[in-house]
C-alpha cells in the first residue's frame, strides 16, 4: 500500500470511530448536550464534515476556495439545526468523505501546495501541501472522535472507543 492509500485509510478509520459514537441514537439524543460544552454528537459530525469539505476545496483551489462557513455560521456547525436529522448529517458526512477520497486518489502529486489563509492560528506565509492537509484532517477527525466518545458516554454510558 502506498502513502496515498495509507493516508486515506487512516482518515477513514477515524471517520468510522466518529460515526460509531452515533450508532443507535435518535435525532433528539444526537442533538443533546451532555457536558458543560456546547457540543453535541450531531453537531460534531456536522462540523467535521464542513471542515473536511473546506480543506478539500483548499487542496484544489487554495485559500480563496475555503471561504464560507465562517463567523456566525461557525457556532452553528456545532449544533443540530431545526429539521436536521442524524441520518441526514451522517449521509452528508459520507458524501464529503467519498469526495475527499476521490480527490486524493486523483491528485497527480501530494506535494501540490497553496499558501494558507490569513488567520491568527496560521503562521504567516506558510503553505500546506495536500499531504499536510490530509495529516491535519486525520488529527482533526481523531480529536473530535475523542470528544464524541465523551459526549456519548455522558449521554447513555455507551463507549465507542474504550
Label the model's feature ranges.
Residues 1, 5-8, 80-90, 124:
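Charge-dense, low-complexity intrinsically disordered segments
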Residues 76-115, 131-138, 142:
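Acidic/histidine-rich alpha-helical segments that form the ligand environment
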Residues 4-22, 27-76, 116-162:
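Short, contiguous alpha-helical
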